[in-house]
């Protein structure tokens, strides 16, 4: 047994150079585990076109070998974990690729396990499951890099930039340099410090201060990369990205730490930012980077700005500036551009941290512009983003208890800028209604109505390469995997997800219904079944209670921006026709006129008209209205106000920073359409609208909506009985054994039947 010591992330990697067994009685036939890929990104795809983990076997002999019925395993305790199909052969000097994706349903050469990125064992056993033929213990792997035998160096294991399935491995790196040590962790600072960086094993540190990655695998060093020679003075807001480098070794993973100095943030300056290389225009319209001195220097707010910046979590994005702002390829300067696959997605580092004991994480992922009308730069300078977690960036999921909910693994997240009812909007009426919590409130409400998958989220301050970008919402996105996780089904089961009605197609692609996951087939089936008004089948393919709750919410909140092709989402279907569920999405035009009896589109889904013609559906609808709007239900006045106050408290101080960043945009930077143009501030505008909703909207809205539903024939004029337990109002819940239930008739006449 030979030991090869590779310092990979501080761990010892043991490679077993076994006295390999001769196969099939031939003295010349030997089978090796030749190469593995544990993180994808190498351009090798399976029959479904997906980049999966894989294991390559190599027959070093001259004669063919039958490897059928041999075993592959990633667990020493279970040597017979996956059996190679009978009759599988490797010809002399040939190779066999086996997909280690954990999904045997994808094909005969798909093993029932996947390879761990942090390292594990891979073993090949003979047909008896006892005799070990070959084995490799590997350490932490890198995206797009394989681990294989270098046959020009005696078959030692090395890291290789070029995957060579079906061919002999050549060259490679001796090991991976360990991660860079930072003397100070990301976070908030008031006083400057000397940042020390270090790496063991004889390597040296390369770093950047402009957000770009100092090193790209296969791409070399960044043009702005510097060699660390001594402590770095950090006395202003700064993003430091560093990598360990050593000749002949694969560089370490890039480490990223953002250091925020609140007193520096409030002095964020337009001229200095442009002088640093940022563009003065975004898509032909004036760029704005400044924190407005009229807010930061105002005695009312100056003393509260530091606390405002620390009051909610911070999300820091770091990337090459060109990825965001290049005139041709930047996603922010080309917000209307959409392409296939990853064409308009850019690699970034994301850090999430808090001044308190809140979330703390860093992950590399993809960033893209998100939205419809909000992408138009003349309508809003502040764009929403989507975060995508993929193996090509390092991790296929964000594994973190982000929202204190049941879902702790994410393939995507939403960074919502808030387009409608925001201080940057082109319409003066909407600017005066800015609250930055309406969409949160809608999603919270759907959850409280009994829909735990209703998209959890919280507010964050966003920074891009150290530049404060404003107040954003970070929340779940209703993807296929989101549906699977919340409904307890296998994450690999095909599920469909849609953004608006995909059968609704108009000339504007950004506001046309789209399939975001899967196919349109199950959605077409749902619409067909509903059109036939087959109540029995409808209940199988539609989560009726969820659809009713979603509909009631949109009517109650007066969602005047509900459209056929956008501003709502749904998921379900798939080959097994899972029940479709609906989600509040882009609920920004709500809680405006308390007396309104209109929404954007009465039947945005194309389902409601047929459903409400079914007596059983109307009865269920009335039951859900009563559940939510009476007896301290989720839509009772007290519960509505409680949710609103909770979200208001969350951003109460944070909106001061948003005001300084964007409150002057329409007055001072880009006047569009009509005025009046104000400097929008917390006390004058945000507080006034907040109090209007509390004092004028919620107190009367229930009566307005109940009359509306009654006029639509969806709620009876007769009041429901009032339940009491031992003389106290109680509708549901636990009671003591032997308690006395009484039912009172609130109507002037009639009887109660039960």
Report each predicted region and the residues it spans:
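Bacterial N-terminal signal peptides
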Residues: 13-23
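Activation on beta-sandwich/Ig-like modules and their edge loops
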Residues: 27-159
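Conserved oxyanion/phosphate-binding beta-strand-loop segments in alpha/beta enzyme cores
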Residues: 369-421
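ATP-dependent phospho-/nucleotidyl transfer catalytic cores
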Residues: 400-434, 467, 473-557, 620
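C-terminal catalytic region of ATP-dependent kinase domains
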Residues: 574-710
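Bacterial N-terminal signal peptides that target proteins for export
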Residues: 2-14
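Active-site acidic catalytic loop and adjacent metal/ATP-binding pocket
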Residues: 317, 387, 540-596, 698
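Short, compositionally stereotyped local motifs that mark structural "simplifiers"
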Residues: 29-32, 88-92, 98, 141-339, ...
């Amino acid at each position: 047994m030979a030991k090869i010591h590779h310092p990979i992330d501080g761990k010892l990697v043991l490679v077993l150079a076994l006295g390999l067994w001769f196969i099939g009685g031939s003295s010349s036939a030997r089978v090796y585990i030749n190469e593995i890929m544990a993180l994808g990104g190498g351009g090798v795809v399976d029959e479904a076109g997906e980049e999966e983990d894989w294991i390559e076997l190599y027959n070093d002999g001259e004669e063919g070998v039958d490897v059928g019925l041999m075993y592959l395993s990633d667990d020493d305790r279970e040597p017979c974990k996956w059996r190679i199909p009978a009759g599988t052969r490797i010809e002399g000097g040939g190779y066999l690729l086996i997909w280690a994706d954990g999904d045997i349903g994808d094909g005969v050469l798909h093993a029932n396990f996947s390879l761990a990125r942090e390292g594990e064992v891979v073993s090949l056993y003979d047909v008896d499951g006892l005799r070990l033929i070959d084995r490799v213990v590997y350490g932490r792997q890198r995206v797009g890099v394989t681990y294989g035998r270098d046959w020009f160096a005696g078959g030692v294991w090395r890291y290789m930039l070029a995957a060579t399935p079906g061919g002999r491995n050549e060259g490679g790196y001796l090991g991976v340099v360990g991660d860079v040590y930072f003397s100070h962790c990301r976070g908030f600072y008031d006083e400057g410090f000397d940042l020390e960086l270090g790496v063991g094993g004889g390597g040296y540190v390369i770093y950047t201060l402009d957000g770009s990655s100092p090193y790209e695998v296969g791409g070399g060093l960044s043009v702005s990369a510097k060699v660390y020679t001594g402590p770095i003075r950090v006395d202003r807001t700064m993003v430091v990205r560093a990598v360990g480098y050593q000749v002949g070794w694969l560089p370490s993973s890039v480490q990223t730490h953002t250091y925020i100095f609140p007193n520096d943030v409030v002095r964020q300056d337009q001229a200095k930012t442009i002088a640093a290389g940022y563009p003065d225009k975004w898509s032909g319209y004036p760029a704005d980077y400044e924190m407005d001195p009229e807010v930061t220097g105002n005695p009312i707010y100056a003393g509260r700005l530091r606390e405002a910046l620390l009051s909610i979590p911070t999300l820091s994005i770091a990337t090459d500036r060109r990825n965001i702002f290049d005139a041709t390829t930047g996603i922010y300067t080309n917000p209307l551009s959409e392409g296939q696959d990853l064409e308009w997605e850019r690699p970034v580092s994301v850090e999430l941290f808090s001044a308190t004991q809140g979330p703390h994480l860093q992950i590399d992922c993809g960033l893209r512009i998100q939205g419809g009308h909000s992408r138009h730069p003349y309508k809003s300078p502040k764009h929403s983003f989507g975060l995508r977690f993929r193996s090509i960036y390092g991790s296929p999921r964000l594994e973190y208890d982000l929202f204190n909910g049941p879902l702790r693994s994410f393939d995507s997240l939403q960074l919502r800028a808030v387009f409608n009812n925001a201080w940057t909007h082109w319409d003066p009426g909407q600017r005066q209604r800015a609250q930055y919590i309406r969409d949160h409130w809608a999603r919270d409400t759907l959850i409280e109505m009994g829909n735990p998958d209703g998209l959890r989220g919280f507010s964050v301050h966003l920074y891009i390469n150290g530049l404060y970008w404003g107040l954003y919402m970070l929340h779940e996105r209703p993807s296929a995997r989101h549906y699977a996780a919340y409904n307890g089904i296998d994450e690999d089961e095909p599920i469909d997800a849609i953004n608006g009605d995909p059968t609704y197609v108009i000339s504007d692609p950004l506001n046309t219904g789209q399939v975001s996951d899967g196919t349109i087939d199950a959605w077409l089936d749902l619409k067909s079944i509903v059109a036939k008004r087959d109540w029995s089948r409808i209940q199988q393919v539609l989560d009726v209670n969820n659809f009713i709750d979603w509909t009631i919410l949109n009517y109650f909140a007066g969602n005047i921006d509900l459209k056929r092709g956008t501003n709502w989402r749904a998921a379900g279907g798939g080959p097994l026709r899972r029940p479709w569920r609906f989600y509040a999405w882009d609920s920004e035009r709500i809680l405006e006129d308390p007396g309104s009896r209109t929404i954007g589109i009465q039947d945005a889904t194309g389902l409601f008209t047929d459903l409400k013609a079914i007596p059983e559906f109307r009865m269920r609808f009335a039951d859900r209205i009563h559940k939510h709007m009476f007896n301290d239900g989720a839509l009772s006045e007290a519960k509505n106000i409680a949710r609103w106050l909770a979200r208001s408290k969350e951003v109460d101080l944070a909106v001061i920073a948003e005001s300084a960043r964007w409150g002057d945009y329409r007055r001072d930077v880009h006047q569009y359409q009509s005025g009046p143009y104000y400097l929008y501030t917390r006390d004058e505008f945000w507080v006034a609208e907040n109090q209007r909703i509390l004092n004028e909207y919620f107190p009367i809205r229930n009566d307005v909506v109940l009359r509306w539903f009654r006029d639509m024939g969806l709620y009876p004029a007769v009041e429901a009985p009032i339940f009491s337990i031992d003389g106290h109002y109680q509708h549901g819940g636990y009671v003591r054994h032997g308690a006395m239930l009484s039912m009172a008739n609130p109507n002037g006449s009639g009887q109660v039947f039960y």
